[in-house]
Swiss-Prot record:
The record marks 177 as: Important for dimerization. SUPFAM superfamilies: Coproporphyrinogen III oxidase (SSF102886). It is found in: Cytoplasm. Its main location: cytoplasm. Homodimer. Its cofactor is a divalent metal cation. This is Oxygen-dependent coproporphyrinogen-III oxidase. Residues 242-277 are annotated as: Important for dimerization. Belongs to the aerobic coproporphyrinogen-III oxidase family. GO terms for biological process: protoporphyrinogen IX biosynthetic process. The gene is hemF. The lineage of its organism: Bacteria, Pseudomonadati, Pseudomonadota, Betaproteobacteria, Burkholderiales.
Length: 302
């Protein structure tokens, strides 16, 4: 179990993504390297890369963190009560890109490795991650391309993984109180160890490496589409759903806040502008209504 190899991959992934997306945007990611003091309950370090007010990205962040703690927080043991009381080591890369143009979709990706340990027992390790697409104005070809890229990334590890991880994503990124999906989904997995450490690590790398080919061509095609105030207003309204999900349901956000993580880095996923309107409904037959009828309901895209 070579966690240093995982760390090296994650740092390289962060570099590759910020370089490629910075080239698309024309802006520069600001790098914030941080360390948690050894006196805090969560120890470790990380590197947060942020681009704000760019030509393409209104806000985008790519964060790497490598942290350790003496006790797993409740969000990490909710599905694994046998791990309560163990110390842990967690490392990962998490990103969210919020484009300025409402016709360009938001994307989220995360890959992570987790080790729970106790002196009198073998360490328990697993990988998690995935990526999902959140359009404001949907294009079937974009959703199909995104899902096709996810499917191709997973195929070498078993044809059953894509449909399984897609369903997991559809179930996970669902706002129960709104009875609607956050976007058009993608793939999601957690507590994954079934292929053994090396092969599971390889699968996680395939997911991380798929982010750029999955999202970059869509952003390149959509970021210059003409738009007006109506589209920006709808984008801000739908971004409100993103905020609701991240603060109410997202396991990564809850884990970070419950374990004493770095708040600025945890909340870098938040959109720069969002709003709420009381009981707003889209006009029937409008492009805004099409998001609800044609894109948010779960469906097979490939």
């Amino acid at each position: 179990m070579d966690t240093q190899a995982v760390r090296a991959y994650l740092l390289d992934l962060q570099d590759r993504i910020t370089t490629a997306v910075g080239t698309l945007d024309g802006g520069t990611f600001v790098t914030d390297t941080w360390d948690k003091p050894p006196t805090e309950r969560l120890r470790g370090s990380g590197r947060t890369c942020i681009l704000e007010n760019g030509a393409v990205l209104e806000r985008g962040g790519v964060g790497f963190s490598h942290v350790m703690g003496d006790t797993l927080p409740p969000s990490a043991t909710a599905n694994r009560p046998e791990l309560a009381g163990r110390g842990f080591e967690a490392m990962g890369v998490s990103l969210v890109f919020h484009p300025r143009n409402p016709y360009a979709p938001t994307v989220h990706m995360n890959v992570r490795c987790f080790v729970a340990q106790r002196p009198d027992a073998e360490p328990v390790w697993w990988f998690g991650g995935g990526m999902d697409l959140t359009p404001y104005y949907g294009f079937a070809e974009d959703a199909a391309h995104f899902h096709r890229t996810c499917k191709q990334a997973l195929e070498p590890f078993g044809e059953e993984l894509y449909p399984r991880f897609k369903q997991w994503c559809d179930d996970y990124f669902y706002l129960k109180h709104r009875k609607e999906a956050r976007g058009v989904g993608g793939i999601f997995f957690d507590d994954f160890a079934e292929l053994g450490f090396e092969r599971s690590f390889e699968m996680m790398r395939a997911v991380g490496d798929a982010l750029l080919p999955a999202w970059l061509p869509i952003a390149e095609q959509r970021h210059a589409t003409p738009y007006g105030e109506r589209e920006r207003a709808f984008q801000a309204y739908r971004r409100g759903r993103y905020v609701e999900f991240n603060l109410v349901f997202d396991r990564g956000t809850l884990f970070g806040l419950q374990s004493g993580g770095r708040t600025e880095s945890i909340l870098m996923s938040m959109p720069p502008v969002a709003n709420w309107r009381y009981d707003w409904q889209p006009e029937p037959g409008s492009p805004e209504a099409a998001l609800y009828t044609d894109f948010l309901p779960a469906r097979d895209w490939v």
